[in-house]
C-alpha cells in the first residue's frame, strides 16, 4: 500500500470524541501487522511499546488523538430534522456540508446541514455570521420525527463530517490525525 493510500484510509475513518472505536480498530490491525502488541487504557486509548536494542536508549513517546469534530443528536423535531450538541466544534466547517449520522444500532444515515449561502444575502442588509449550534439544522430527508424514529434515530446518536482525502497540489493539510498517521505508516 502506498503512503498516500495509507493516509487516505486513516483520515477517512469517521470518529468523533467518545466514538473513536473505528480508528482504534484500524490502528490495532495496523500495529499487529507491524509486529507490535497493542494495549488499551481505560479511556479507549491504544498504545504499543517498542523496546530498543540499544542499552540505555532514550525513551520517546509519540502521542496522537484519534477524534475529529462531530455532534450528538439532542432532539428530533416534528419535521424530522435534528438539533445537536457539539462533540469538538468548529463552526466554520458546518454550513451546507455532508455528514453521516451513526445510530446506536449501527446504521449509517447520510445527512446534510442547511445554510443560506452568503451570495444570497447580498443586498438584504444581513451580514453572514457563524451559526450558533442551536441554529444548525441537520436534515436526513425524513418526512417527520416518526419516520426518523423508524430508521432508528434517537437522542444520543452521533453525527460526523463526511470527508474525502485528496492529494492537492501542495498536499493535504493534516492536523487532527497527523500524529496517528505517524504511528502506523
Report each predicted region and the residues it spans.
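N-terminal hydrophobic/helix-forming segments and targeting peptides
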Residues: 1-185
Amino acid at each position: 500500500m502506498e503512503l498516500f493510500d495509507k493516509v487516505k484510509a486513516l483520515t477517512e475513518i469517521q470518529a468523533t470524541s467518545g466514538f473513536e472505536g473505528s480508528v482504534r480498530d484500524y490502528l490495532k490491525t495496523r500495529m499487529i501487522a507491524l509486529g507490535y502488541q497493542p494495549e488499551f487504557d481505560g479511556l479507549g486509548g491504544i498504545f504499543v511499546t517498542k523496546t530498543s536494542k540499544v542499552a540505555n536508549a532514550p525513551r520517546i513517546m509519540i502521542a496522537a488523538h484519534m477524534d475529529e469534530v462531530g455532534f450528538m443528536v439532542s432532539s428530533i423535531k416534528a419535521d424530522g430534522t435534528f438539533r445537536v450538541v457539539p462533540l469538538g466544534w468548529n463552526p466554520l466547517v458546518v454550513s451546507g456540508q455532508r455528514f453521516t449520522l451513526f445510530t446506536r444500532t449501527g446504521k449509517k444515515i447520510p445527512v446534510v446541514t442547511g445554510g443560506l449561502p452568503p451570495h444570497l444575502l447580498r443586498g438584504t442588509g444581513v451580514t453572514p455570521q457563524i451559526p450558533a449550534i442551536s441554529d444548525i439544522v441537520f436534515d436526513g430527508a425524513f418526512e417527520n420525527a416518526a419516520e426518523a424514529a423508524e430508521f432508528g434515530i434517537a437522542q444520543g446518536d452521533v453525527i460526523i463530517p463526511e470527508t474525502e482525502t485528496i492529494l492537492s497540489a501542495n498536499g493535504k493539510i493534516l492536523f487532527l490525525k497527523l500524529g496517528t498517521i505517524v504511528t502506523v505508516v
